[in-house]
A protein has these predicted regions:
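Histidine-acidic metal/acid-base catalytic patches
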Residues: 1-10, 17-21, 26-28, 62-66, ...
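Structural motif corresponding to the early beta-alpha repeats
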Residues: 41-167, 178-179, 229
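Non-cysteine beta-strand/loop elements that form the S-adenosyl-L-methionine
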Residues: 32-40, 74, 116, 143, ...
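Residue-level "edge-of-site" marker
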Residues: 17, 40, 77, 119, ...
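Active-site-proximal beta-alpha loop/turn segments in soluble metabolic enzymes
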Residues: 146-162, 188-198, 302-304
């Protein structure tokens, strides 16, 4: 298995749903060896209905290596894999068992990081066509438009119910992850608001992340630190949160993006026009001992770009490459 603790701070091409010639060439032409997959909507590579199987995971990792790439992490099983566990519904123990099997299979296949979230209804936006710099299109969120949205489930769910379900889940999963040698990386709620459609969103603040790390207290449990989601919470908390968690070795990888504005209203942005000085973010990660990988994550939709936003991703990764070179030289 890839020893993530022995590698330097580095860039990765991320949010891939499949490994194809386009993705391979994109990474190689940018000089990036490390990659990450996001399987939130499923994937041709990992076709399971309840869990991911060992041979499928092994084939994916081997295909990456055959292409000269290193598979660092997979994030987000399809939410149907564990929605009963998230809501504490009948059948949650069976779903937890399937998730345990998935993590065991990832370990056997030599995939070191599994990124996950606890956002029952996923990512919410109220617009996908807001205009950013130069007419590029970005997603945006305005809490006023959805604060009273109808229930997405049969009833409301409180903070403490969701915390109880999270505690039950993570304490069942972590021992398996430790045994399998897999690191679990928790992503914030996006948007980080108190509730949506009657369901509490608990991974929304610095204090709540401290609580989550205390509940799941293990060297194999840490953060997928999404800078954009933390910036949505409060731009002023981003650097203190990095110092706190990175100094403890709790940041396993980073979604390196930003937004303009904070909850209750924000829009996504190019990497150099958001709330934060992203070079200071990169420098703080380095100074705090972070040695994981950084990926570009969400990017604006530039004119005449591909469906995967190759132009916009290349712009973001180019900016990130220069920042990383500068912090390494210093």
């Amino acid at each position: 298995m890839l020893d993530i603790h022995q590698l330097p701070m580095r860039l990765a091409v991320g949010q891939l749903n499949q490994l194809n010639d386009e993705a391979i060439l994109f990474a190689k032409q940018l000089g990036i060896q490390d990659i990450q997959f996001n399987m939130y909507h499923g994937s041709v590579h990992l076709p399971g209905e309840e869990q991911w199987e060992y041979m499928d995971l092994l084939r994916l990792r081997t295909a990456c290596e055959d292409a000269g790439l290193r598979l660092n992490a997979i994030e987000n099983v399809p939410i149907k894999f564990y929605i009963k566990a998230m809501l504490g519904l009948p059948g949650r123990d069976e779903q937890i068992e399937h998730m345990q099997n998935t993590i065991r299979n990832m370990g056997r296949a030599g995939i070191p990081i599994f990124g996950y979230h606890w956002a029952i209804d996923g990512v919410w936006r109220t617009s996908s066509t807001t205009l950013a710099r130069g007419g590029a299109k970005v997603t945006a969120f305005d809490y006023a438009e959805v604060q009273n949205a109808p229930l997405t489930h049969e009833r409301p769910y409180s903070d403490e119910e969701i915390w109880d379900n999270y505690t039950y889940y993570i304490q069942a999963i972590l021992p398996v992850a430790e045994e399998a040698g897999v690191h679990l990386a928790l992503h914030p709620d996006d948007p980080p608001v108190p509730q949506l459609a009657g369901v509490a969103r608990i991974m929304r603040s610095f204090d709540n992340f401290k609580r989550a790390m205390e509940i799941g207290n293990s060297p194999n449990h840490g953060l997928d630190f999404c800078v954009g989601s933390w910036s949505e919470m409060d731009a002023d908390v981003v650097l203190p949160a990095i110092r706190h968690f990175a100094s403890q070795g709790k940041i396993f990888y980073v979604h390196f993006r930003d937004v303009l504005g904070t909850v209750p209203k924000f829009r996504e942005a190019f990497i150099n026009e958001g709330n934060l000085d992203m070079f200071e973010v990169m420098k703080t990660l380095k100074e705090s001992g972070f040695n994981g990988f950084l990926l570009d994550d969400h990017v604006p939709m530039m004119s005449n770009d591909s469906g995967w936003n190759n132009r916009s991703r290349a712009f973001a990764l180019g900016q990130m490459s220069v920042m990383l070179d500068m912090v390494n030289r210093n």
